[in-house]
């Protein structure tokens, strides 16, 4: 099963840290995402504290009210290698693909070692787009395994994107997403028109939208502009305490996205202007001059 099938937009459900440290909730999220029509599950893999900008600062855990170091907080949100393996098995058993944003070289190794036969895709998060050594390594791993490397462009200018693309090994299957690193993102900051620009600059890449908004409409618009994959932050309940719930879609929202983008893809056609058989009876009745 390919990550992308022509004519169907690939929807990736990003679990982020919305399980609030609960592996049981993670399992529920994977099952709910599959039921809602997602094609893939994505998680985050970090090596704590190596991949943290400031691990020593204090953090109040939103769902417990307990104060701890930032490193302790991030560790609470991380999956163990066994949990990564179990989530991958569950995801694949439900007919979806499994991958992760890897925040460092050690995280890449952790993911590859933990998951049977390795992940189905890698992703470079927006914050990693200037880490060209990491992106190059992920592209080599992706090329070697025959899987995609996804690039997210939040907080990037075109030069940053070009640097990341050029750092990838030739022949790697690259997927590039328009993204705005704002959580949740206001519609006027989504800039989905950039999808046109990306398609023009990178005609050989699969262009998509890494979405942090909470409306279905811009996602459908992005598909109309040529996006063929969409990443959504996913939660079981947007009212839960935590860092990403407010910028996430619940199962009902993902179900709407699936329905609406499928409808849009059917409506787009192939660009050929034609007379459909269903129009014949109408024209026979209304057209006065043949």
Predicted regions, residues:
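Catalytic cores and adjacent flexible loops of soluble metabolic enzymes
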Residues: 1-290
């Amino acid at each position: 099963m390919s990550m992308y099938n022509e004519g169907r937009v690939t929807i990736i459900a990003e679990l982020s840290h919305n399980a609030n440290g609960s592996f049981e909730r993670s399992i529920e999220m994977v099952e709910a995402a599959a039921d809602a029509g997602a094609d893939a599950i994505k998680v985050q893999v970090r090596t704590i504290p190596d991949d943290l900008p400031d691990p020593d600062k204090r953090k109040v855990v939103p769902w417990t009210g307990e104060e701890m170091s930032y490193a302790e907080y991030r560790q609470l949100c991380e999956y163990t290698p066994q949990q990564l393996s179990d989530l991958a098995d569950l995801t694949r058993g439900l007919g979806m693909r499994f991958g992760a944003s890897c925040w460092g070289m050690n995280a890449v190794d952790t993911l590859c070692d933990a998951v049977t036969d390795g992940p189905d895709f890698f992703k470079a998060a927006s914050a990693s787009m200037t880490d060209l050594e990491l992106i190059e390594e992920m592209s080599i791993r992706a090329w070697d395994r025959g899987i995609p490397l996804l690039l997210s462009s939040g907080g990037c200018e075109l030069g940053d994107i070009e640097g990341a693309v050029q750092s990838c090994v030739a022949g790697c299957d690259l997927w590039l997403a328009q993204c705005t690193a704002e959580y949740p993102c206001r519609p006027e900051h989504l800039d989905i028109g950039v999808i046109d620009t990306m398609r023009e600059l990178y005609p050989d890449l699969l262009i998509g939208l890494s979405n942090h908004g909470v409306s279905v409409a811009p996602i459908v618009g992005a598909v109309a502009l040529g996006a063929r994959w969409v990443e959504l932050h996913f939660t079981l309940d947007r009212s839960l305490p935590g860092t990403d719930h407010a910028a996430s879609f619940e199962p009902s929202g993902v179900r709407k996205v699936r329905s609406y983008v499928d409808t849009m893809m059917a409506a787009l056609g192939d660009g050929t202007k034609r007379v459909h058989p269903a129009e014949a009876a109408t024209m026979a009745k209304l057209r006065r001059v043949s």
